[in-house]
Swiss-Prot record:
<keyword id="KW-0488">Methylation</keyword>
<dbReference type="InterPro" id="IPR045853">
    <property type="entry name" value="Pep_chain_release_fac_I_sf"/>
</dbReference>
<dbReference type="Pfam" id="PF00472">
    <property type="entry name" value="RF-1"/>
</dbReference>
<dbReference type="GO" id="GO:0005737">
    <property type="term" value="C:cytoplasm"/>
</dbReference>
<protein>
    <recommendedName>
        <fullName>Peptide chain release factor 1</fullName>
    </recommendedName>
</protein>
<dbReference type="InterPro" id="IPR050057">
    <property type="entry name" value="Prokaryotic/Mito_RF"/>
</dbReference>
<dbReference type="GO" id="GO:0016149">
    <property type="term" value="F:translation release factor activity, codon specific"/>
</dbReference>
<dbReference type="InterPro" id="IPR000352">
    <property type="entry name" value="Pep_chain_release_fac_I"/>
</dbReference>
<comment type="function">
    <text>Peptide chain release factor 1 directs the termination of translation in response to the peptide chain termination codons UAG and UAA.</text>
</comment>
<keyword id="KW-0963">Cytoplasm</keyword>
<feature type="modified residue" description="N5-methylglutamine">
    <location>
        <position position="237"/>
    </location>
</feature>
<dbReference type="Pfam" id="PF03462">
    <property type="entry name" value="PCRF"/>
</dbReference>
<dbReference type="InterPro" id="IPR004373">
    <property type="entry name" value="RF-1"/>
</dbReference>
<dbReference type="InterPro" id="IPR005139">
    <property type="entry name" value="PCRF"/>
</dbReference>
<comment type="similarity">
    <text>Belongs to the prokaryotic/mitochondrial release factor family.</text>
</comment>
<keyword id="KW-0648">Protein biosynthesis</keyword>
Amino acid sequence: MFEAVEELVAEHADLEKKLADPSVHSDQANARKLNKRYAELTPIVATFRSWKQTGDDMETAREFAADDPDFAAEVKELDKQRDELTEKLRLLLVPRDPSDDKDVILEIKAGAGGDESALFAGDLLRMYLRYAERIGWKTEIIDSTESELGGYKDVQVAVKTKGGQGATEPGQGVWARLKYEGGVHRVQRVPATESQGRIHTSAAGVLVTPEAEEIDVEINPNDLRIDVYRSSGPGGQSVNTTDSAVRITHIPTGVVASCQNEKSQLQNKEQAMRILRSRLLAAAQEEAEKEAADARRSQVRTVDRSEKIRTYNFPENRISDHRVGFKAYNLDQVLDGDLDSVIQACVDADSAAKLAAA
């Protein structure tokens, strides 16, 4: 299983030499790329060295145990350590999502259920904002359309690590956690507008895309159609007397992004381009993932974005994730941002599926 690790150890040593050369840092973009790869390999190399050392220590202990039975317990303990390191190394060798270090743009759309769905979209927004606050991420509402009762028909939020340029540690970006949130979220509760106390079911859709930098996506200006219009508020009333809202269409793919929250047309255009870049990057990645998934579909089912991924049942205070069979009765805490146990269940299931396929 670990034949390829020796090659990674050699690559790690080569990167260490390159990064020690001051001339390498004159090209900052290349230096960042080398540093990122070095950081990715460091835990693999460290664990592999511990694994090898434990194996050597175990052989030595076995030799001593032949003459001194007191060493038998040490052999047993070292054997246990080696098994643990073997499993840790297997996990480290699972192919990583290249976007795990990235920040994200999270979009919540009200779905079936009218006003109640829009109110639920607002609850989801608050949940994600609270979760980000707990972790120390930064959030920025890019664009939103409020409903008449105070919910959201549509809201887009940028979620960033503290530095605002993705994670400094490999695999610790916002995407690594929030990518499992994409899909249809269903709510079961008595709506505020329900006079007879009947439980209703409604839903809101969540779309999560890794935020793309300009270097990630090349966009030809000739492929864009830019439309301007007046901003609108709840109920569709105009809130601006100038055509400051912007809608950008990427003609080759039909991908559309719009923004109306900023005060000027230029600011709205910049935000719309930001959303468009992330959507185009996500579309390209999904196409690549689809091709890879077609080849392995018969072997493994991984956690992915699918319809009705989660149910929020208010009468029972229950949260259920249907993809991984997760169920807990702390819905009030989850909606207050205590999402880690739900997300970790998805992370663990995804890792297990990838390990089984490796």
